[in-house]
């Protein structure tokens, strides 16, 4: 089996690590209309990403990493680590529109196999304001399947866990889709299981039954 977990709002209580970082770096007021413009069709996702990252140009990467490492995991995360230990033959992947540093934490702290996220360009220890790669807002499922194929990962079942509308494409590609602590914008389309609790322990209890 392959378990694919969204990160922001699923593994962490922070719905958006982008906004979390904007708040810390005091750039939230400059970016507050970007999402509105995107959802109104005035910006492409590539333009939205570029405009946000430009606000962090020349930020020391170690400062940026410390902010990301300050993001907590959800309550009950230790149960997921135990579940992952018991499922040692299965593949656990973190897939996020958030940053690779949070994906690295999922590998090191939660013992996931790998991650897919925003890979930031770094030059001389500072952010350049550009990204090397990132999942499209409406393309996480496509990105996940391509990752599995390119890494020759075979599986009998693909189980996906997410919380928001940008996880819908991922849900469409999965054998079992689970909405965990879902946002109010997420409808039941393409979702097999809804878990309104935000405690990871309750999610893990469901995973044991699948």
Annotate each PLM feature:
Residues 1-46, 50:
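Active-site neighborhood of HAD-like aspartate-dependent phosphohydrolases
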Residues 2, 69-210:
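C-terminal cap/substrate-recognition subdomain and adjoining C-terminal extension
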Residues 4-11, 33-40, 57-60, 97-105, ...:
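Short, mixed-charge, low-aromatic patches
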Residues 14-15, 43-48, 63-70, 131-134, ...:
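Short acidic/polar alpha-helix capping motifs at helix-coil junctions
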Residues 24, 34-37, 51, 55, ...:
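Residues that form generic nucleotide/phosphate-binding pockets
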Residues 25, 56-59, 110-111, 151:
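A broad structural signal for alpha-helix termini and local helix breaks/kinks
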Residues 29-35, 61-64, 155:
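Short, surface-exposed acidic
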Residues 47-79:
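Metal-dependent phosphoesterase signature
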């Amino acid at each position: 089996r392959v378990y694919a977990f969204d990160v922001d709002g699923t593994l962490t209580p922070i719905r958006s690590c982008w906004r979390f970082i904007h708040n810390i770096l005091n750039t939230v007021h400059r970016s507050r209309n970007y999402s509105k413009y995107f959802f109104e069709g005035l910006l492409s996702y590539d333009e939205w990403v570029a405009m946000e990252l430009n606000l962090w140009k020349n930020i020391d990467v170690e400062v940026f990493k410390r902010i990301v490492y300050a993001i907590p995991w959800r309550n009950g995360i230790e149960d997921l680590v135990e579940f992952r230990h018991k499922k040692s033959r299965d593949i656990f992947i973190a897939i996020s529109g958030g940053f690779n540093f949070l994906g690295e934490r999922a590998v090191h702290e939660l013992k996931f196999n790998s991650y897919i996220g925003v890979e930031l360009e770094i030059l001389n220890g500072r952010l350049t304001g550009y990204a090397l790669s990132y999942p499209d807002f409406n393309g996480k499922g496509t990105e996940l399947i391509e990752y599995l194929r390119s890494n020759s990962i075979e599986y009998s079942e693909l189980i996906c866990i997410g919380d928001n509308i940008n996880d819908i494409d991922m849900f469409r590609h999965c054998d079992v889709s689970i909405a965990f602590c879902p946002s109010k914008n997420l409808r039941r389309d393409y979702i097999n299981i809804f878990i309104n609790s935000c405690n990871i322990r309750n999610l893990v209890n469901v995973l044991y039954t699948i």
